[in-house]
UniProtKB/Swiss-Prot annotation:
Record text on subunit structure and interactions: Homotrimer; associates with NifD.
Cell membrane keyword on record: no
Domain of life of the organism encoding this protein: Bacteria
Family: Belongs to the NifW family.
Any single GO BP term: nitrogen fixation
Species whose genome carries this gene: Burkholderia vietnamiensis (strain G4 / LMG 22486)
Function: May protect the nitrogenase Fe-Mo protein from oxidative damage.
Protein name as it appears in the record: Nitrogenase-stabilizing/protective protein NifW
Keywords noted in UniProt: Nitrogen fixation
Keyword Calcium in annotation: no
Amino acid sequence: MTPLAERLKHLSSAEDFLQFFGVPFDQKVVDVCRLHILKRFFQYIRQQASIPQDTEAALFATYRDQLARAYRDFVASTPAEEKVFKVFQDVDGRQHVSVDTLRASLPARGTA
């Protein structure tokens, strides 16, 4: 395991990642979008055609750039608009539940 990978294992919060990579951030944005930022960051890393493995500095710079890009997505937009998580991808985050389905899920009157 590379020294960078070893250090990344100890990061847990969005703030940890942003501070580690030196990405300036507004705490208000992170408070609302922390999970979205991290998920988008990892999506960008997976989508990248080639990730430099020749030097730690190149790898660090690539990761920093992708994290900054993910953070910027949520400065300019909202989690619902970015649709990072499946709940936002499914029919614009809405699911149809019929009244009949709701009635069927309720206990029968006179019981309980």
